[in-house]
Amino acid sequence: MKIVDINERLAISGQPNTDEFINFARRGYRSIINLRPDGEEPNQPGNDAEQAAARRAGLAYNFVPVIGTSITEADIQAFQRAIATTEGSVLVHCKSGTRALMLYALSEVIDGRMKRDEVEALGHAHGFDLGRAVTWLKRQAIQTPRVSGFFDPRTGSIQYVVTDQTTKRCAIIDPVLDFDEKSGATATTNADAILAHVEQQGLTVEWILDTHPHADHFSAAQYLKQRTGAPTAIGTHVTKVQRLWREIYNLPTLSTNGSQWDHLFADGDVFNVGSIKGRVMFSPGHTLASVTYVIGDTAFVHDTIFMPDSGTARADFPGGSARALWSSIQAILSLPDETRLFTGHDYQPSGRHPRWESTVGEQKKANLHLAGVDETTFVALREARDKTLPMPKLILHALQVNVLGGQLPEPEANGRRYLKFPLNALEGAAW
């Protein structure tokens, strides 16, 4: 196995045997980054075996599985983090070394340390063909809009800033207000990171959009509205969710006309992010109110379709329906195959890095709940799986905030805000 030194900290290689890891440590490497998805070849060691070998050799280890034809910015960010968090020399491997050098080149271009027209020469200098990296950069240059994802590890949620590069106007989608259920503390760490990005990029926020009332985190829509002045919006069927949860929470004074948001979108409504056209697709199933935002060549599909290796979202919340979810997913998959899909959650199966971008074509081909599956099979699979899933730990905390558009309950006489829990309201939920 040939090791190619790229710089003083980074080397790349093809697939090593696990018994070589101890020699890597002796040669001064401090970390191994494995870029190969499990199952690429029958005889590859795989993530578990490599992690164990790294531990025995005293090496740090990161699993960042990528496919050369579907690398996303989330993959590049994970590659950068894996290198940045390691002191000393790093050995990155895939099958041949090409993906490793491709990720390095893309990282350098995105961060401005390398020009796009220098990528091919970098590959030739080290004996690799980086044609795919050149193609990736050309494709990225014409994609509209520009999408930046912000992953919240506490809830597995992804928040988005969707930008029209021409006008520097943007929309924020599904922002998270931090909440610690053990202490009852709230914070704005996630939202402030989004605001910092907006400021750094010189953007004007045009919309603050929620895809549905979330059951696993508080919405930061109201906080961001206060900070930016941008209007908030959600799908018009949120009123059905408000009526449903008004009864569950016994909140007779809760207004259920959606007035907590500045705008309610109906199915088919259109809007703009700068000069880019957007439209709204009603996408029920996960909740009664779920919508998909189609903006330029992207669709923000919330809790309908997860990444292909994760499948689809649950449909057993009050008002949910696996059959309705199937119909919503089929409408999303009727978009052009090259449409970029951005999911609402990622739970990092097999310990991989967070990912959130795919395409319609990739989902049709590889989603483990959808590829080669008909409606009857999907509904049976989804309903059976949902019976085994415990409720999200924040569902009763989050929904009483999110049916108010992200507004916290009003302070009581002592100046404190309180949440209210119904007992035994979610009958049949798994523990």
Swiss-Prot record:
Q: Which family does it belong to?
A: Belongs to the metallo-beta-lactamase superfamily.
Q: Which Gene3D superfamilies match?
A: Protein tyrosine phosphatase superfamily (3.90.190.10), Ribonuclease Z/Hydroxyacylglutathione hydrolase-like (3.60.15.10)
* Entry cofactors: Zn(2+)
Tell me, in a sentence or two, what this protein's role is.
Could play a role in cell adherence or biofilm development.
Q: What class of enzyme is it?
A: hydrolase
BP terms from Gene Ontology? glutathione metabolic process; hydrogen sulfide metabolic process
Keyword Zinc appears in the UniProt entry: yes
Look up the EC number in the record and give it. Answer: 3.-.-.-
Per UniProt, where does Zn(2+) bind? Answer: H212, H214, H286
Superkingdom of this protein's organism: Bacteria
The induction annotation reads: Repressed by BigR.
Q: Where does substrate bind?
A: D309
Misc remark: Probably part of an operon that comprises bigR, PD_1892, PD_1893 and PD_1894.
Its protein name is: Beta-lactamase hydrolase-like protein
UniProt keywords (A-Z) are: Hydrolase, Metal-binding, Zinc
Q: Can you provide one Gene Ontology molecular function annotated for this UniProt record?
A: metal ion binding
Q: Which residues form a coiled coil?
A: none
